[in-house]
Curated annotation (Swiss-Prot):
Keywords: Amino-acid biosynthesis, Aminotransferase, Arginine biosynthesis, Cytoplasm, Pyridoxal phosphate, Transferase. It comes from Lactococcus lactis subsp. lactis (strain IL1403) (Streptococcus lactis). The lineage of its organism: Bacteria, Bacillati, Bacillota, Bacilli, Lactobacillales. GO terms for molecular function: identical protein binding; N2-acetyl-L-ornithine:2-oxoglutarate 5-aminotransferase activity; pyridoxal phosphate binding. Binds 1 pyridoxal phosphate per subunit. The keyword Amino-acid biosynthesis applies. Its main location: cytoplasm. This is Acetylornithine aminotransferase. It catalyses: N(2)-acetyl-L-ornithine + 2-oxoglutarate = N-acetyl-L-glutamate 5-semialdehyde + L-glutamate. Homodimer. N(2)-acetyl-L-ornithine binds at residues 124, 263.
Length: 377
């Protein structure tokens, strides 16, 4: 008997402790974590500077409404602002960040349509869900919000056809579709989207899963020299303390005048204290190490797994990697066998094993994970 809604497919054990990149359950089992709490714990479970900052803030002030100045918000916003090119709005989650982005877009572009891509994922609240072009996510919730249009990801021809047919004001997308199957954006699609921006279409980049160092850059769009009009963050921003952020170019700041949007808990002192330490930690040296480990891990997985009959492809960027299986029915079985052997991983799409290890994981542990995957597959 549970008093909880059963909207999650929970596994039959509890995780009770975390250390660095390891998790421990209530039965005494130890797991090497290749999930990071679904891309949240980028600095692992023992990020001491973050813990110290949160504990100190808890002793000082745990909540402050947005009726007053908040220097901690200013500190974090400055670190995210790309040399003061963007203004920040803080909230509590990824879907809230995307809702803020969509509201701002509506104020700027009025009744023009927003284009989103099939298999993208932007959240489960109504606006974000309307932009999430996955039938399994939208099923049962019609009518969704109007003025959203779908097009296949990485399909330049389809994009051009949509632009000819519809009055598109903005495009929302991920650099790597995470929930959709760890599918990276293609170079020709990058150029097509930049061309859209040059024609006055807003680019909204969802960095909820790819941001905060996951791909070897602070933001994944930096790999492709994008300058998004709007981008969104959450998950790893405060390393386990719930927070989200929507950032927009300075020229759009006036659209969110007083009272146009808000959040009771957004940018609260505990989250900002943690986020401030996270952003201090993820400097250029740290990101170089993530890039190096990502290259090492992807090469290792390719060498060990590409010859397997069960593996169709291996793809990713930095420490965000997907292993596509030839038989989608094998995904739950592989995940279960990995758990039994002390490794936690995720699924994505319908046929992909998704690996999101903490960015602090060592090459020794990455190799251990690769060897176990080789054995299981």
């Amino acid at each position: 008997m549970t008093n909880l809604f059963e909207n999650y497919g929970r596994l039959p054990f509890s995780l009770i402790k975390g250390e660095d990149q390891y998790l421990f359950d209530d039965r005494g089992n130890k797991y090497l974590d290749f999930t990071s709490g679904i891309g949240v714990m980028n600095l692992g479970y023992s990020f001491e500077k973050g813990k110290v900052a949160v504990k100190a803030q808890l002793d000082s002030l745990s909540h402050l409404s947005n009726l007053y100045q908040n220097p901690l918000q200013e500190d974090v916003a400055e670190k995210l602002s790309q040399n003061h090119s963007y203004k920040a709005f803080f909230c509590n989650s990824g879907t809230e960040a995307n809702e803020a982005a969509l509201k701002l877009t509506h104020l700027i572009k009025k009744d023009q349509k927003i284009l989103a891509f099939t298999d993208g994922f932007h959240g489960r609240t109504f606006g974000a869900m309307s932009a999430t072009m996955q039938e399994k996510i939208q099923a049962g919730f019609s009518p969704l919000l109007p003025n959203f249009v779908a097009s296949p990801f990485n399909d330049v021809v389809a994009l051009e056809q949509i632009l000819e047919k519809e009055k598109i004001g903005a495009i929302i997308f991920e650099i790597i579709q995470g929930e959709g199957g760890v599918l990276p954006i293609s170079p020709d699609f990058v150029e097509a989207l930049k061309s859209c921006q040059q024609k006055g279409i807003l680019l909204i980049i969802d960095e909820i899963q790819t941001g905060i160092g996951r791909t070897g850059k602070l933001f994944a769009f930096e790999h492709f020299d994008f300058e998004p009009d709007i981008f969104t963050l959450a998950k790893a921003l405060a390393n386990g303390i719930p927070t989200g952020a929507m950032l927009a170019k300075n020229k759009y700041a006036s659209y969110f005048s007083a009272g146009k949007h808000g959040s009771t808990f957004g940018g609260n002192p505990l989250a900002m204290a943690s986020a401030n330490e996270v952003l201090k930690e993820i400097d250029s040296d740290f990101l170089e190490k993530v890039t190096d480990k990502g290259i090492f891990f992807l090469k290792l997985l390719t060498e060990k797994l590409s010859v397997k009959a069960t593996v169709k492809s291996i793809r990713g960027l930095g420490l965000m990697i997907g292993i596509q299986l030839t038989d989608e029915k094998k995904v739950p079985e592989v995940l279960a066998l990995l758990r039994e052997n002390g490794l936690l991983a995720l699924s994505a799409g319908h046929d992909v094993i998704r690996l999101l290890p903490p960015l602090v994981m060592t090459k020794v542990e990455l190799q251990k994970g690769a060897e176990l995957l080789e054995k299981i597959l």
